[in-house]
Amino acid sequence: MAASVLGSLLRTFRQAVPPSASGQVRGYYVDWRMLRDLKRRKMAYEYADERLRINSLRKNTILPKDLQEMAGDEIAALPRDSCPVRIRNRCVMTSRPRGVKRRWRLSRIVFRHLADHGLLSGVQRAIW
């Protein structure tokens, strides 16, 4: 008896809740490029302090040239993805790398689509 009541409750719940709201439709990352960028962001954060200290030694002109060259070698020995220049801003919905509005983290195409349909709070079309 309890199993049938539970089953009927579960069926009514599934009908009441749309399928997109009940579970995740696809993976968290849109594609492999976004995952690669996330790995680069983590590595850049991990090595940020060390990279800052070594670069300050390398760019300090008061120190001897030998020490500056050693610091340059240490920077070269760090992982390539630890450099913050390799981080690319991407759209969180499409993973598009260009034309990304930094404040919303959306590409210009997705931004305009969502703004036109009133799905971005505080954003409205310019009318004059």
UniProtKB/Swiss-Prot annotation:
Molecular function GO labels: structural constituent of ribosome
Keywords in alphabetical order: Mitochondrion, Ribonucleoprotein, Ribosomal protein
GO cellular component: a single term: mitochondrial small ribosomal subunit
Domain of life of the native organism: Eukaryota
Protein's GO biological process: mitochondrial translation
Subcellular location: Mitochondrion
InterPro entries linked to this entry: Ribosomal_uS14
Subunit structure comment from the entry: Component of the mitochondrial ribosome small subunit (28S) which comprises a 12S rRNA and about 30 distinct proteins. Interacts with LIAT1.
Record-stated family: Belongs to the universal ribosomal protein uS14 family.
Protein name: Small ribosomal subunit protein uS14m
Encoding gene per record: Mrps14
